[in-house]
């Protein structure tokens, strides 16, 4: 069965595993999910991720990050642009999440970028998700 919105599924699995205090979450692999995981790692929301070859297809294993007393690194995740309603932002009107404390993940013509990277490069694109 095909999935309508694999990015929303990825974010939902992360949100559920994070709220259940799991150490890692396994999900189906795709290039865009791996790129989102790379952004989350570089911004400090997850500790690491890896790709594993499964019997059928690849899987992406994301290791969640918690503080010393098990406080969550990810306070919230929200899918912005959906298959039924795409949301785009110009380079002059990029969104800021919680006044710059969070991150907006934007799909640009030069790949996935955070809102700060896209602003620095002067590119806009589709706003995929907010993470804070």
Swiss-Prot record:
MF terms in GO: rRNA binding; structural constituent of ribosome
Database matches in InterPro entries: Ribosomal_uS8 (IPR000630), Ribosomal_uS8_sf (IPR035987)
GO biological process annotation, one example: translation
Signal peptide: none
Keywords: Ribonucleoprotein, Ribosomal protein, RNA-binding, rRNA-binding
SUPFAM superfamilies linked to this entry: Ribosomal protein S8 (SSF56047)
Superkingdom, natural source: Bacteria
GO cellular component, one term: ribonucleoprotein complex
Annotated Pfam families: Ribosomal_S8 (PF00410)
Family the UniProt entry places it in: Belongs to the universal ribosomal protein uS8 family.
Subunit structure: Part of the 30S ribosomal subunit. Contacts proteins S5 and S12.
Function according to Swiss-Prot or TrEMBL: One of the primary rRNA binding proteins, it binds directly to 16S rRNA central domain where it helps coordinate assembly of the platform of the 30S subunit.
Protein name: Small ribosomal subunit protein uS8
């Amino acid at each position: 069965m095909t999935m309508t919105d694999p990015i929303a599924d990825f974010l939902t699995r992360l949100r559920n595993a994070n709220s259940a205090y799991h150490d890692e979450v396994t999900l189906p692999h795709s290039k865009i999910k791996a790129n989102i995981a790379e952004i989350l790692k570089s911004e400090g929301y997850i500790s690491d991720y890896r790709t594993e070859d499964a019997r059928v297809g690849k899987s992406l294993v994301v290791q969640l990050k918690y503080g010393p007393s098990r406080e969550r690194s990810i306070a919230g995740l929200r899918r912005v642009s959906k298959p039924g309603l795409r949301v785009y932002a110009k380079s002059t009107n990029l969104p800021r999440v919680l006044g710059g404390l969070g991150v907006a993940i934007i799909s640009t013509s030069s790949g996935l970028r955070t809102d700060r990277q896209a602003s620095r490069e002067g590119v806009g694109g589709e706003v995929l998700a907010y993470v804070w």
